[in-house]
Amino acid sequence: MNEPSRLRALRRAMSSEDIEALLITRLPDVRYLCGFTGSNAALAVTPRKSVLFTDGRYTAQAHEETRAARVRITEPLQTVVGEACALLERSIPKKIRCYYDPAHTTVSALAAMRASLSTGRRRGFFAPLKEPIVSELRMVKDADELDRIAAAALLGNRLFHAILQHLQPGVPEAEIAASLEFFARSMGAEGMSFETIVASGPRSAFPHGRATAHKTPRNGFVTLDFGVILKGYCSDMTRTVCLGKASRSERSAYDAVLEAQQAAVAAVRPGVTSGEVDEAARSVLQKAGLDKYFTHSTGHGVGLEVHEPPRLGREQKQELKPGMVVTIEPGIYMPGRFGIRIEDMVVVTEKGARVLTPVTKALIEL
């Protein structure tokens, strides 16, 4: 991974906004910038220095993983955020402010920040960022990130083919999810990127239907939405298959969702806004009279986290850029009847989009 170049890019972004000190407490951002994967950390960044703060449990791990930042182990009874703030207060000139991301700073971290200011002489020392500059950097993936995401997606593709062999009527959804997760670990995944969704029959109309003891029907749709973590990066894909033969109305609905998904993939290219991609999917479903059943956005970014910016939703203005990785996942959900969702991960290229999950999207009837 290329942490030094990421910190250089961050410093350029800080300079353009006249930011001379930044405190980062969001763990995926810390990992992105310096490589540390522990569960308790803060990263302080100034124009010339970057210091990772963590506690004594992670001494060896921090020194092994961290690149482009000095490691500082906090004293017992001192919070990581509090010690980072105290150092910044001592080392930064009085008129300089330290910025933080208000969207990803917890209440406890904010309390530690305030408590670290021992006197009122630095009132206003901490200030919220106007724009989430680390999140903006993370939206465009570098070559190493793209390789890792592609590898995770490839593993997801293999999992889909493996789990098809276990899909049959009368099997608890939770058993299917457990089998899928077992296969994932057996194939080298570090874990699942989110709780596996297996929703069958009328439950497929739940967009985020958790796998339950409900048994798969003799006839009806089964929605499989899953992802893995590999080398720290996530995958995410959805396919909807049919047990038994689909009815005419089920097939017609499936074809409409597939057409919407393909239209959105075709709309992805540099310069297009995320809202325009959403509209490409939504307009197809509108023509089919199904848009009222499409109750979520068309997609989202994927990387160190399975849900990242940009969001591909109505009226979203984020312009797509080469190197962004997003999902395209329109769906329809008819309560009491069925639901259908089809999801691919795509990377934005110089000329369009490359699909990372090229598993068949033709309706599979088992």
In which residue ranges do the predicted regions lie?
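Active-site neighborhoods and metal-handling regions in enzymes and metal-associated proteins
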Residues: M1-L366
